[in-house]
From Swiss-Prot:
One of its GO terms (molecular function) is rRNA (uridine-2'-O-)-methyltransferase activity. Signal peptide: none annotated. It comes from Bordetella pertussis (strain Tohama I / ATCC BAA-589 / NCTC 13251). S-adenosyl-L-methionine binds at residues 60, 62, 85, 101, 126. Keywords: Cytoplasm, Methyltransferase, rRNA processing, S-adenosyl-L-methionine, Transferase. This is Ribosomal RNA large subunit methyltransferase E.
Length: 210
């Protein structure tokens, strides 16, 4: 009964969510697009000519935002967008996509080959592991995903490049922040308005490699 009530509450909240309605109006595949838009505007990131890597890209709303930001005359992408996700993603015009598990060495190597030594301006990561509800185990999974994004960014970003990554407050969060501060000159936390109030998610914006 409680589970059924929770499901009904979630459906009601989802249907009445202004960001869900706005995403539908603007043609975004998910409300998460507005989280990225707010961060990009606040940080003045992502412009034409940039090379952008989108980790955890499905269903594609962040790739859609990147395509809009990089669109030049005639709507052609001025720059490059490479997206990766474990799940399939419907094509986004101008976006190169790899389907695979970012935690696997073989997939990381495939992504590195696609980047092909080209310096990356911005890495955006909306990746989130499957959570079990067991605090210690979940914290370890979250920390692992954030560390993988960090290692990839440090290997491929330009010296003045940036990384936007989703994290969650809780056990292990301070260690994630500390590890980012060890590698970047500036690290800030952002909680976009489109993030639901009850959600523990927060986004780290790391800029300028040390």
């Amino acid at each position: 009964m409680a589970k059924n009530k929770f499901s009904k509450d979630w459906i009601h909240q989802h249907i009445n969510d202004p960001y869900v309605k706005l995403a539908q109006q603007k043609g975004y595949r998910a409300r998460a697009a507005f989280k990225l838009l707010e961060i990009l505007d606040a940080e003045k990131l992502m412009r034409r000519g940039d090379v952008v890597v989108d980790l955890g890209s499905a269903p594609g709303s962040w790739s859609q935002v990147a395509r809009e930001r990089l669109a030049g005359p005639g709507g052609v992408v001025d720059g490059r967008i490479i997206a990766l996700d474990l799940l399939p993603m419907e094509p986004v015009a101008g976006v190169e996509f790899i389907q695979g598990d970012f935690r696997e060495e073989e997939v990381l190597e495939q992504l590195a080959r696609m980047v092909d030594g080209q310096p990356v301006d911005l890495v955006i990561s909306d990746m989130a592991p499957n959570l079990s509800g067991v605090g210690v185990a979940d914290s370890a999974r979250i920390q692992h995903v954030c560390e993988l994004a960090l290692e990839f960014a440090c290997a491929h970003l330009k010296p003045n490049g940036a990384l936007i990554v989703k994290a969650f407050h809780g056990s292990g969060f301070s260690q994630i922040v500390q590890s980012y501060k060890q590698r970047f000159k500036r690290v800030v936390e952002r909680k976009p308005k489109a993030s639901r109030d009850k959600s523990s998610e927060t986004f780290l914006v790391a800029r300028d490699l040390k």
